Amino acid sequence: MRIVFDVTPLSHPRTGVGNYIRGSLAGLAEVAAGKHEIVAWAPTSAAGARHVLEALDGIPVERRIVRFPFAHAWRTIWSRAGHLPAERFIRPFDVLHFSDWMFPPQRSGVRSTMIHDLVPLRFPEWTTPRTRSMHAAKYRNAARTCDLLFVNSRYTGRETEELLGVSADRIRVAYPGVEPRFRPEGDRADLGRSYAVTVATLEPRKNLDTLLAAHRLDPHGLALAVVGWPGWGPQPDLGGEDVIPLGFVANDELPRYYRGAEVLVVPSRFEGFGMTVVEGMACGVPCVVSSHPSLDEACGDAAVRVDPDDPEAIAAGIGEALARRDELRALGFEHARGFTWGACGATMLEAFEAAA
């Protein structure tokens, strides 16, 4: 079986979606080795191709990187127009799995996609008009044409049924995995003092303003390290006392900041899954996490849960996590062991084989 796997989002420095795409492809390649042909495909720019090839390093798959000028505009027009099937650009395939933003037309074979979350439909006020428009088009196309829709949590699966009207038999839950670099052993970041850390794109949904308010109430003397680069919308004021803005941190460096922290705080109002929670647990840091049910599967019973809109509750949660440090580290580490990219790849391959 020939499986074409769209990796176009790897054209940019990796954040959550890119990490999922790379990890799920690596897991698929692992379980399909010797049985099926896996092709990583990306119609992208010359600069994007460099990012893609760097991200694919170490994954044993065929690379089919097609370079276009004005690649983003081309992909958007191609997806919306629905002409020129993907077979015009890549050899015939049995499965086409596309990831995010692009939804290429195809002539034959199993059609598969990934739904990371439905924020543009559920909470349109937390997205840009461009994001709402493109994702709404992708969602409609996926609901109408896809044989398989993978989701990263049961929560997102229920949302997909409810908001897109997709029957449960077309939906598969493929949980993300934890890369081996996220482990308790290894270097720790030294920021000159004890700190709490949060890892998030700086945008309204991530709720950094409430976390900053909680930080001002925190009686434990921790600095607040903020990892993440600006997203859209009003930006939080990171110039306060004992706030350490770190900007974008590459994936290879991120475990150091988890390991060095006294606590990881994830105050997000909504997530498709919440991978930063599991990464932090795998590195042995106690976690304080929003009580929104979209984060339940990432947390299990291994985190302190708090009202994301209550600064006092977040501050109290940090105190509880510090008091229960050893217990939460043990619970979190055990919980994180249940998330592997091999298991994610096995879920995908089983579905592809059944549908082909």
Regions found by a protein language model. Give the residues of each.
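Carbohydrate transferase catalytic cores enriched for Leloir-type hexosyltransferases
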Residues: 1-356
